[in-house]
Amino acid sequence: MAFRKKADYILLQKPDILIIPECEHPDKLKFDKDTPEPTDIFWCGTNRNKGLGVFSYSNYKFELVDNHNPDFKSILPLHVTGGQTDFTLFAIWANNPQDKDGQYITQVWKAIHYYDNLLLDNKTILIGDFNSNTIWDKKYREGNHSPVVGKLAAKKIFSTYHKFYGYSQGAEQHPTLFMYRHQNKPYHIDYCFASTDFIENLKNVEVGTYNDWTQYSDHKPLAVTFELPQNKN
């Protein structure tokens, strides 16, 4: 379902920032008069019906980093400013069928090497649809899910879900995808990785349920709440 058709339901969560994979171009976003308007939008994609949208419903503003590499389709490195703290946000929809090396997690693997200098142990978040899980690691593939997790951990950047609930990678108990909306096909493929300063201020992580969200999407929202110090820039 298009974002414009489910925005009212999503916005009941009162997000500061929304990451929406498979999102229509902003020109197509026609909301009802009572629907809150975003204060800033950043969108990329080659298909006007399915791109990657980043929305602010707060004081945060987005700016693409100078060394953005468009070869990593739908991985957006953004400077986020104007809110409680400035930080670097990697909005992710890992899906590039043109890359013969691998269209899903391999995209993230390549991107975190290219943007290595931006992956700091503070003020860094990577979030979105990684289309991956440790259970799908392949023996002869370098860019598996587990090496991605390992490289980020070496930078002191960790999965908020796994930190909050204490599960290991591959042992998640809250699916973020029910493939084809079938309840018997649950997978955890959406993540929010955050640097230690965010992890230290992690307040809550919640995954939407099958019953609440299936009418809107095969994916379930991953909502992450940080309790940040005021005006920490």
Feature names for model-found ranges:
Residues 215-233:
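Surface polyanion/phosphate-binding segment centered on an Asp-His-Pro turn
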Residues 17, 107-189:
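Metal-dependent phosphoesterases centered on the DNase I-like endonuclease/exonuclease/phosphatase
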Residues 90-108, 134-139:
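Surface-exposed cleft-lining segments at the edges of enzyme active sites
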Residues 2-5, 25-29, 97-99, 133-135, ...:
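Active-site environment of divalent metal-dependent phosphoester hydrolases
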Residues 1-35, 230-233:
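N-terminal, active-site-proximal structural segment of metallo-dependent hydrolase catalytic domains
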Residues 47-63, 81, 179-201, 226-229:
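Conserved beta strand-loop-helix elements of the APE1-like EEP
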Residues 1, 23, 94, 130, ...:
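Active-site metal-binding loops of divalent metal-dependent hydrolases
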Residues 22-96:
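Structured beta-strand-rich core segments of catalytic domains in phosphoester-bond hydrolases
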